[in-house]
Amino acid sequence: MLSSTLYAGWLLSLAAPALCVVQEKLSAVPSGWTLIEDASESDTITLSIALARQNLDQLESKLTTLATPGNPEYGKWLDQSDIESLFPTASDDAVLQWLKAAGITQVSRQGSLVNFATTVGTANKLFDTKFSYYRNGASQKLRTTQYSIPDHLTESIDLIAPTVFFGKEQNSALSSHAVKLPALPRRAATNSSCANLITPDCLVEMYNLGDYKPDASSGSRVGFGSFLNESANYADLAAYEQLFNIPPQNFSVELINRGVNDQNWATASLGEANLDVELIVAVSHPLPVVEFITGGSPPFVPNADEPTAADNQNEPYLQYYEYLLSKPNSHLPQVISNSYGDDEQTVPEYYARRVCNLIGLMGLRGITVLESSGDTGIGSACMSNDGTNKPQFTPTFPGTCPFITAVGGTQSYAPEVAWDGSSGGFSNYFSRPWYQSFAVDNYLNNHITKDTKKYYSQYTNFKGRGFPDVSAHSLTPYYEVVLTGKHYKSGGTSAASPVFAGIVGLLNDARLRAGKSTLGFLNPLLYSILAEGFTDITAGSSIGCNGINPQTGKPVPGGGIIPYAHWNATAGWDPVTGLGVPDFMKLKELVLSL
């Protein structure tokens, strides 16, 4: 056996000469997070190594080819095997040897992720770092502010997670503001009723669904993601269907990363997930619906009878999209709605780009990925977290990813106007994509004054990807939903996203029944031919950066104050409502003409 001195020297040799490349580094602990204590070397930690995918420099051009109408290859989506052939994952041989040399044996593969469990002491040496516990309110996470990898692995490894991604998980639902309603009979969509509460009949009228009847056997399916221990409730959906005379249908569930499908009203978190499934069914019934529940715990529990503080540290993004990409197209819905996001600046750029590329690969496979733009308007924190403490607008990720369709929010009824909480603006990570160049230029050149543009330019990146892309009703009046068997009102852009997902499901249904492909990556089509199928929203504006969180109505400690910060809804695309709200019948004619 090695002496303890020799063994310690061997461990240190893992870190010293080989670990010469800092892979990710934060200039400061993100705003709101406080160092509690260094983690004990004996604490367990589970980490994921994201292996690099090759040829991602060709992703955008391939998306352009397959998703641009008029191109001979339009709609000829790829399958799982095609993706692996065009964008292969780097070999894991060198990575596995590196882990084995460190004495790490609990290793598993999930798509392009290498998941492993070890002690904090080993991880500290392996990555030349120091893991510590940080707290933000009730949330405590095991994180570090930088880590390194061996020089010979830089071509194989994209990033290690969770390491420098602190985040501030938030869904976009206003479930905390949900208000109980008395039991009411079903009502037809009339001006008086829809001006008070939004029901399925109101959505039929507002978005011109007409008498369209989808076919459950067409192959069109709709999915939604649930995070933060959320799970939709079967009984509540049945009660919602009964309330609004919707023919009964259920939904299927797939569990990812130790997600839990909790159907107990007393213990489950239901507000966001119920809102998703009820509104999807309201719009797209009887099309099949699937819920993907992604847990926050690691892929496995590392040799422990009970979980430790490190067992609930993973963000869902990587595991969620890796799981979806691991399935063949025949096992996936063709449109997926998500209502979960972080301030873009809290997501390390390496991580954001990795996730965004995974979303782009989903688009190549004919799957439309939607994301609620957020409920914090032009921004809530409005202060840079890079140590400079500069006031700035706060875009929201993943809505800023150019390969996702971000759904903003409207309010009021007949006519709809921009909702002041609808998040939007311009990305600081992602440059403006090709498909929205004309639309954003039109906004910047014709619908914002030169003085305003000059003033805002110190707070935002006008060359960045503009979001949202589209919008749907969010709030005022609220949506009527069922929660724990009772009637509530709720809303937010996380209501807008499932509504839009239901409409995309109907459009896919129409195309599949006509022998055509699904819509897939939607944005190039939205900003060209389909723009005619939207009702432009030209009134209202978003707010923010005033020291108050638009979502909660509460003060933001240390938040930046930017006088006069707002975006106006204007003719054409704008950073509040995007291209506007959908007119299904117009959109159906347009997509069937392709």
UniProtKB/Swiss-Prot annotation:
Its EC number is 3.4.14.10. Keywords: Calcium, Glycoprotein, Hydrolase, Metal-binding, Protease, Secreted, Serine protease, Signal, Virulence, Zymogen. The keyword Calcium applies. Its cofactor is Ca(2+). Glycans are attached at residues 191, 229, 250, 568. The keyword Metal-binding applies. Gene3D superfamilies: Peptidase S8/S53 domain (3.40.50.200). Residues 197-594 form the Peptidase S53 domain. GO terms for biological process: proteolysis. Binds 1 Ca(2+) ion per subunit. It comes from the Eukaryota. InterPro entries: Peptidase_S8/S53_dom (IPR000209), Peptidase_S8/S53_dom_sf (IPR036852), Peptidase_S8_Ser-AS (IPR023828), S53_propep (IPR015366), Sedolisin_dom (IPR030400), Tripeptidyl-peptidase_I (IPR050819). Optimum pH is about 5. It catalyses: Release of an N-terminal tripeptide from a polypeptide. One of its GO terms (cellular component) is extracellular region. Residues 21-187 form a propeptide. N-glycosylated. This is Tripeptidyl-peptidase sed4. The gene is sed4.
